[in-house]
Amino acid sequence: MHVGRKMVEGGRCAEPAVHNFTESITRWGITTARMKTGTPVRIDKRSVHFEDMEEQPGDSDFHQFSYMGEHRVLKQLPCWTCYTNKKVHETLKSGLADSPLYNGQIQSTGPRYCPSIETKLVTFPDKDQHPLFLEPEGEDTNEMYLNGFSSSMPMDIQLNALHEIPALRDAKIYRPGYAIEYDYFDPTQLKHSLESKIIKGLFFAGQVNGTTGYEEAGGQGTVAGINAALHCVGDKTFEMNRDESYIGVLIDDLTTKGVDEPYRMFTSRAEYRILLRQDDADARLTEKAYELGIAKRDRYDWWIEKKEAIGRIIEFCANYPIKKDEINPKLEALGTTPLRAGCKLIDLIARPHLNLTNLSEIIPDLKAALETPANRKEEITEAAEIKMKYKGYIERERLIADKMHRLEDIKIKGRFNYSELHEISTEGRQIGRAHV
């Protein structure tokens, strides 16, 4: 760990280091390299002048992470925003010679999209200010996380710079920001199950695979844990495709492309984003989880009920006739083009400005159908509407994904000699050899 020129062995702050682990792995032929990450200063909220900051409240309308059970809203804590200024920048620049990132102390690569405050100053010298976000670490603590101020500068430089910000002029800190270098292992030496290709029965997950972020680690840990359990009982492996989950995209990227910088999952990395929607995660994964024994029967039954309810709404809309003379005045009142001929209700839902909510206000039969106990949950009507409104796009993307699956399922023997395949480029042969 690096704070200025001070270097300390450890895990995270106040956690012990793991010694000789890398050496015990690499002696079997597993490749390793180094990466770095950083974390911001932690501030005591009792020393902050919040009157000099702008409050940033949380969302008032948000989706649940789980559709199981009743919706329970937790107490919302606001974040606060402020900005750096020229004096802050001058203070930080005065300490660049002692910054591990610029004095040669750290040579490894850090996250592309999480630059330190000193990197921002060097990369964007024309900027007079950078935004900062003060975030509570919890309801029962005074510790606050200063997002945007990741740093490995000496502690006195960090503190002096903070004191140049009006809201933080009296700031006291729990601990300074610091950088940490760590080993990771080449993820292209892993199978899609996250089992090592070199050491049978050894599974890797998280930061050791070159990723950064809690969700990235959690997703890999879930897959690695499932496959480790399956391996112990001799069952086949569990793998997810790129069109089934973002975890599948992440693992496929790691194991086929490798990493040369800390990997973070973005929706832009997925080519099947219409299939990987927030509303259909249960549709994609519940049955798989139930078959593996990691989802209980009540979750599976709830999903079956939801699927049937969605189907009923879609069937109702697909069969419900709309007469133009009856609906046109109401459509004009909603600001949408009147019909030239009669149609089915599902055709109206495909229009951009129409949805189940506003149509239910002008079509009593639809309102009655949506208000039945089995259909009235928001997540059910939302999922049904998405399936109807984007039906053509979903089907087209499904065809593209299925075509790719047919190509992916053509197996190449492990001992295939790519060096003799002169019909492809040198780079192509090198990539092929690397993944044998």
Residue ranges and their predicted role:
Residues 269, 275, 286-433:
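Extended, charge-enriched "interface" segments that sit outside catalytic cores
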Residues 207-215, 271-273:
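Glycine-rich phosphate/pyrophosphate-binding beta-alpha loops
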Residues 217-240:
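Internal hydrophobic alpha-helix adjacent to the cofactor/substrate pocket in enzyme cavities
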Residues 23-159, 251, 256-339, 352:
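An anion/pyrophosphate-binding glycine-rich loop and adjacent beta-alpha core
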Residues 1-43, 165-166, 170, 223-231:
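Glycine-rich loop(s) and the adjacent beta-strand/alpha-helix scaffold that form part
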Residues 35, 102-109, 168-176, 235-240, ...:
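Flexible, glycine/charged-enriched surface loops at secondary-structure junctions
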Residues 145-211, 239-252, 377-429:
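A glycine-rich dinucleotide-binding beta-alpha-beta segment and adjacent secondary-structure elements
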